[in-house]
Structures are given as C-alpha cells and as structure tokens.
Amino acid sequence: MNRLKDKVAIVTGAGDGIGRGIALAFANEGAKVAVCDLNKTAVMDTATIVREAGAEVIAEQIDVRNPAEIQSFVAAVKHRFDRIDCLVNNAAVMPIAPADSIESETIDLILQVNLRAPILFSRYVIPSMREVGGGSIIHMASVTGHNGHPGVTVYGATKGALIALARGQAIELAEDNIRVNTVSPGTVDSPMLHRFLAENASDVKKARMAFDRIHPRGKVGSIEEIAAVFVFLASDEAANITATDIRCDGGYAVQGQQPTG
C-alpha cells in the first residue's frame, strides 16, 4: 500500500477492462488518478470506483484522435493536481482486418489511436514531469508487437512501434529522470476479449478454452496481474528500469502458438 502515495497518474482508455483495473490499482496504492475514455458513461463509472477506493480523481470523455482534446485534458489534470508523475497510454482499438482487404480509414483509425495519441500524450506531460524532477511513462504494448498474428497486422505494427518509441523516449528523457517502458500482455480475461470472441467466434466457449490452452500455464492473464506490473513500473521500486518491455503473457510469446477452434 501507498507505493504511489501523492503521485498523480493519467490513465487513458480507462472506461473498462485493463485501463479501469490500472486506475483502481493506482488508487489503492495512494495515487491521485486522472482517467479518460471515449465512452463517457464508462469513464464516469470508473471514476466512481476509484473515488470509492479513497482516491482523488478527475474523469473526462475525450477522443484521443483529437490532439486538441488530448492537450486540454492534460492541462486540466495539471490545473487540478498541480503535477503529473505518471502517464499510462492504454487506449487502443483492435479491428480485425485482413492484410489484403484492410481499408484506409481503418488504418488511419488504428494509427491515430494506438500510436499518435501516445506520442501526443507524452509530448504534453513531459514538461510537467520535468517540473517535479522526473516521472514514469508506460505504454501498453502487446505480444502482437513481438509475434505475428493474422488479422491484426496493423494493430501489431502499432504495438511494436510503441516498444521502439519507448526505447527512444527513454534515452532522450533519461537526463530528466523520466523513465519510459512498455508492458506486453498476452491474452487477458477482459471486456476486450469478450467482445472479440462475441464478434468473431462461432463457438465462444470453445474459442475461450482455446485461448487458455495456448498459454503455457493453462489460462489467460487477469486484469489484476497486468495492473500490478503497471503499479511497479510507476513506483520508485522501478527507479532503475527504463527502455524496457515487460512481457506479462504467461510465456505465450515464447512458444508463439495461435488459438484454434
């Protein structure tokens, strides 16, 4: 408890799933939390949960495709809390789009949400982190940034790009004591997985079991397991960790199996 006491953290894409889990985990460790999401109802629900955990919170509906909204949100967080210590770039989209038929509009959507938004969020929080003597930027990557996965090639490309982005940012910002890292989950038992199965699997139960089987420990990860990694990277315990990607995937990326069924 209190590993993040008095730190101010921004979590994007916090309307549900892993983003909400990270926000709650940060709150439980003493952080003040700023959450945003495209879904207003969902992000306000997250704010309520965080507040009930005893943390101060600010929540806004924003479209991360809009640079002005990103800049405005970061400014609002700085105005409210007078500092920013941590940024979690979690917001993402993952349309299923085969390489031979993906539409230009879909490419633009994935690039804007998954890559441009983290770059812009980083740009706007860096001055505040410099003011307080450092900070932690954590980008949500994915095993798809390491291994090839059919149907999500552009999504995987953006996740691989985030890993490269973090390494470059980490070196550039090291003298400012701003650490930059990525986390690459495997499959996680989350609303995103549930939506993916509902939209793409003919037999949801069978497909869900297939995802469990391809992970060496026999099950997919949990939101709490992923959130714990983010807490660690945001804390002073990770003071010497930067330019690093932590694969939190139960060994999935090493064996590289694809789900079937």
Regions found by a protein language model. Give the residues of each.
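Alpha-helical segment proximal to the catalytic Tyr-Lys
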Residues: 127, 171-175, 239
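Conserved glycine-rich cofactor-binding loop
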Residues: 8, 15-17
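Active-site helix of classical SDR
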Residues: 122, 158, 166
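Residue(s) in the substrate-gating loop at a strand-loop-helix junction
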Residues: 142
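Substrate-binding pocket helix/loop in short-chain dehydrogenase/reductase
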Residues: 98-99, 103-111, 211
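C-terminal helical subdomain
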Residues: 182, 190, 204-241, 248-250
